[in-house]
From Swiss-Prot:
Lineage per the UniProt record: Bacteria, Pseudomonadati, Pseudomonadota, Gammaproteobacteria, Pasteurellales
Protein name according to UniProt: Dual-specificity RNA methyltransferase RlmN
Family in the record: Belongs to the radical SAM superfamily. RlmN family.
Cofactor: [4Fe-4S] cluster
Keyword S-adenosyl-L-methionine part of the UniProt annotation: yes
PROSITE patterns assigned: RADICAL_SAM
Encoding gene per record: rlmN
Length: 371
């Protein structure tokens, strides 16, 4: 028996080709995308503007399948974390409500291969890339849950950030089509400024990205010099800070989504990267790059070798950068009581890399495949 095609793996253009191959009019794809994403429908029989003959044909060859929720946890601050089942493993997706928006933090891989030393996900190792349906399916599943609770005042998703488990630019082949669906007016219709891709700095993939899609960009920098970044963000040994910042500036030069500015993410690690001297170094690194800087309180996880920067050290770091004219925001920690805060996502990962502590030191050995 031929395996059914999961229509969530297709962009609208790909679905139009799929319908042509079925001998049907391409506009049927527009209808189906609306049913799936506007109305959260995964049952062909409920698609009333599609005739029964076509519905029966679709049921024979296709399915609409998103990850199922295995566990839901709710924080006192309104944050919701879902562990979603993908095969025999789990990924994590986080809903973060705020006064004027609601952001969904989406995973791109089962685990992560980059081995950043301050991140819980990295300690789980890496298993595989998520498919398009497993990425966009996180948005679909979360929207469906929130829709069911809409009467209680839970805010619909307004923003999506590719900041969950994994490095998005090591899964370009699936992340970009998923983001296309986030932007597609027939699907979720989010503004390109409300879809953010966060990367630790896979420079060749970032250089290619501008020709594929225009979305908001966030850079996980976390250190102001190569010596320190080599240690805590090992991919820096392959693509150093200068290479990364040059690539960022190239992306900004052709992007409309970023308003000419990139977001720089900087986790505050006590007496590691949070001194006044580090702040001066960071200002020098970013002096020719229009940006806003997010200072992120570090969120602890078991066996981590770090401490959280004191409020005093964070304040001094922020003020030093602001004296240079930078916009600097100290991110409010959300969902830390359910381990849903930045750097705490772990999921349930079968590590295929079998990395040792020694291997983790060699970021230059990270295999970067551009797809």
């Amino acid at each position: 028996m031929t395996e059914k095609i999961n229509l969530m793996n297709l962009t609208r253009q790909q679905m139009r080709e799929f319908f042509k191959e079925l001998g049907e009019k391409p506009f049927r794809a527009d209808q189906l995308v609306k049913w799936i994403y506007h109305f959260g429908e995964d049952n062909f029989d409920n698609m009333t503007n599609i005739n029964k003959k076509l519905r029966d044909k679709l049921k024979a060859v296709a399915e609409i399948k998103a990850p199922e929720i295995a566990v839901e946890q709710r924080s006192a601050d309104g944050t919701i974390k879902w562990a979603m089942q993908v095969g025999d493993q789990q990924i994590e997706t986080v809903y973060i409500p705020e006064a004027d928006r609601a952001t969904l933090c989406v995973s791109s891989q089962v685990g992560c291969a980059l081995a950043c030393t301050f991140c819980s996900t990295a300690q789980q190792g890496f298993n595989r890339n998520l498919t398009v349906s497993e990425i966009i399916g996180q948005v679909w599943r979360a929207s469906k849950v929130i829709g069911e609770f809409g009467v209680t005042g839970i805010r619909p998703i307004t923003n999506v950030v590719m900041m969950g488990m994994g490095e998005p630019l090591l899964n370009v082949a699936n992340v970009v089509p998923a983001m296309e669906l986030m932007l597609d007016d027939f699907a979720y219709g989010l503004s390109k400024r409300r879809v953010t891709l966060s990367t630790s700095g896979v420079v060749p993939a970032l250089d290619n990205l501008s020709g594929m899609i225009d979305v908001a960009l966030a850079i996980s920098l976390h250190a102001p010099n190569d010596e320190l970044r080599d240690e805590i963000v090992p991919i820096n040994k392959k693509y150093n800070i200068k290479m990364l910042i040059d690539s960022v500036n190239r992306y900004l030069s052709v992007s409309n989504a970023n308003h000419g500015k990139v977001t720089i993410e900087y986790v505050m690690l006590d007496h590691v990267n949070d001194s006044i001297e580090h702040a001066h170094q960071l200002a020098e690194v970013l002096k020719n790059t229009p940006c806003k800087i997010n200072l992120i309180p570090w969120n602890p996880f078991p066996q981590a070798p770090y401490g959280k920067s004191s409020n005093t050290r964070v304040d001094k770091f922020q003020k030093t950068l602001m004296e240079y004219g930078f916009t600097v925001i100290v991110r409010k920690t959300r969902g830390d009581d359910i381990d849903a805060a930045c750097g705490q996502l772990a999921g349930d990962v079968i590590d295929r890399t079998k990395r040792t502590a020694a291997k983790r030191q060699f970021g230059q050995n990270i295999d970067v495949q551009l797809q």
